[in-house]
């Protein structure tokens, strides 16, 4: 692919999430989040018993980290304001002003170094107490407490920050925690899962509404989705139908209400058919239609390939795989450490779908990166890791983002996951994603 010039208005940055980089320093009793709850109840399943207590210690190193980002030529940095840290009491609505000053200084450092702050308001860091009282996002009360939190954050920072995102990958902790049972709270409860999905979508309308007074300041609000393109094994009708259902349950469940203002009718029919339909109030659908997001972030790592089921789905509880089976394409390019396929052209497919099916809403690649286990094997005699594999991965995806922009898709940036090695759920630091290596012994 030919070299491409990066447009002046195209953001290049890195992404992070609070619980994966900050650690728990500065947090007070009662400010535990989902991540601490996950680790504290099941430390033995986390790689090397490493959890979110320290993470990569951004809390103490943010000034030097941000300065180094800028020295790399970055023009943006996406981070999370951690709900559990920001609120001293998330139920009573009491703000922790120590946290306010910490985040204010982070924003100041980003702008001082010539970068655009991009803020996610929730990256799985729901306060732990809301799990104990309301079953997390399954409880409707959580929607209103989230709204209370969002209003408090916007009141503090609307003048300094213009690019806001209500959620990052809202589906992942729900699917892993309530559908597949591999993350906290380790359930196989599809009805609860779809209730939680619905409540996150409803909560987004509250955030959109809360943002309205600040639109005149140039503020915009979006959502960052783990939007994984779905590809059928073949053009046969049964494989095409399998891909249709995988896309319906994994992509359109969020994309359609966020961008079209309504759920796909086929999705609602299937939820009713499988006794998984969520509870709602009629006014909820009116709000979903009225209060839509301004932009979209796309977290893309790998495609999903599916085929028609060859054996009947025989589990006791519903799962979307009732309608399809995963398919591994022979001869694919893939990351052997994670088992994830590498398919850069999917970025073009994503961009053209947004252009053609979703009114060409502004969007950017909000996460893209490659996790490698045992990177020490690539260390050279000077002590640096020769990560040409990472350079090739990032270059290929960035080139596609620029390509699809040139095709008329409204792509405004590309953000790498991540700047420095960060903690992941269960895998901890097993797979390294950073542009910079983190020495766990020295920090």
Predicted regions and their residues:
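Active-site region of glycoside hydrolase catalytic domains
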Residues: 2-46, 70, 90-91, 100-443
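Active-site mouth loops of central-metabolism enzymes
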Residues: 47-61, 138-140
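A common structural microfeature
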Residues: 9-11, 59, 76
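Catalytic domains of carbohydrate-active enzymes, especially glycoside hydrolases
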Residues: 61-82, 290-296
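Glycine-rich, proline-tolerant flexible connector loops at the mouths of alpha/beta enzymes
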Residues: 81-95
